[in-house]
């Protein structure tokens, strides 16, 4: 590294002398440039109808001309931004990252809300299968048992759970943002580089389609989670229990009647 730096500082490259810079500056600039180049390289053009100027828009042929800054480069871009939230590139990059991360959490959360109820309806014993009541089991005398089995995971300390969450999630987020032990950031949002166990980035066209599927399902999951929150507040039941009640008696168990008869605090 020292020999390389000395040769660069004392010779010319492409007819222009290279300025004498400290090795730390060269290394720092190289790291930044490598990350920027890698990030740009991940934006793969696709012949898919979900990318480019001819992509599917939010109202189809009635959508009109999308804003100039929405070029169809990223997954989930339907050319709709009436509030101008994506006009500033830095704000757009930040919001895009937040949306993708929230989409993933919402998909996991929606599965976590429905799956325990589904298992409970098929004979698996839980202390509490309702997603919004399950956490309160930690305050019971017996504590919180995973899948109702104390030999799997048994928790009685809220502080211990909080500490584990902070440590584990902090490690995962740190790995995602910093690029892991190798310090390689190809794209902090998607697999690639040092972390791509399924080899998704090796198939650019298929990977581009998967990104669209992820963002579409993630947006639906965020709406689903909002619906689960409202259901829990209004009916005090989980999503599958509410669905079963509606199927059994759709006339008296529907969103309109429940909403109009809802009294906060009762």
From Swiss-Prot:
The modification Phosphothreonine is found at residue 37. Chlorophyll a 5 binds at residues 213, 231. PANTHER family: CHLOROPHYLL A/B BINDING PROTEIN. Chlorophyll a 1 binds at residues 80, 86, 99, 219. Keywords: Acetylation, Chlorophyll, Chloroplast, Chromophore, Magnesium, Membrane, Metal-binding, Phosphoprotein, Photosynthesis, Photosystem I, Photosystem II, Plastid, Thylakoid, Transit peptide, Transmembrane, Transmembrane helix. Its main location: plastid. This is Chlorophyll a-b binding protein, chloroplastic. Belongs to the light-harvesting chlorophyll a/b-binding (LHC) protein family. The N-terminus of the protein extends into the stroma where it is involved with adhesion of granal membranes and post-translational modifications; both are believed to mediate the distribution of excitation energy between photosystems I and II. It comes from Triticum aestivum (Wheat). It is a multi-pass membrane protein.
């Amino acid at each position: 590294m020292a020999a390389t730096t000395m040769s660069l500082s004392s010779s010319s490259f492409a007819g222009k002398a290279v300025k004498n810079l400290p090795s730390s500056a060269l290394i720092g600039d190289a790291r930044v440039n490598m990350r920027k180049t890698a990030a740009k390289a991940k934006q793969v053009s696709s012949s898919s109808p979900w990318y480019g100027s001819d992509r599917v828009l939010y109202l189809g042929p009635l959508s009109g001309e999308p804003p100039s800054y929405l070029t169809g480069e990223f997954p989930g871009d339907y050319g709709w931004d009436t509030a101008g939230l994506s006009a500033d590139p830095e704000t757009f990059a930040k919001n895009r990252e937040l949306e993708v991360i929230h989409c993933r959490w919402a998909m996991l959360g929606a599965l976590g809300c429905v799956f325990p109820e589904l298992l409970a309806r098929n004979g698996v014993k839980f202390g509490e299968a309702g997603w919004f009541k399950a956490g309160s089991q930690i305050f019971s005398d017996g504590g919180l048992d995973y899948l109702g089995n104390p030999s799997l995971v048994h928790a009685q300390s809220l502080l211990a759970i909080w500490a584990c969450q902070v440590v584990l999630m902090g490690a995962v987020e740190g790995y995602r943002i910093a690029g892991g032990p190798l310090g390689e950031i190809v794209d902090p949002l998607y697999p690639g580089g040092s972390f791509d166990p399924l080899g998704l980035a090796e198939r650019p066209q298929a990977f581009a389609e998967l990104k669209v599927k992820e963002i579409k399902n993630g947006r639906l999951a965020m709406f689903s989670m909002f619906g689960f929150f409202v259901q829990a507040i209004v009916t005090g039941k989980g999503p599958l229990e509410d669905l079963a009640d509606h199927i059994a008696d759709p006339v008296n168990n529907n969103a309109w009647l429940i909403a109009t008869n809802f009294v906060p605090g009762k």
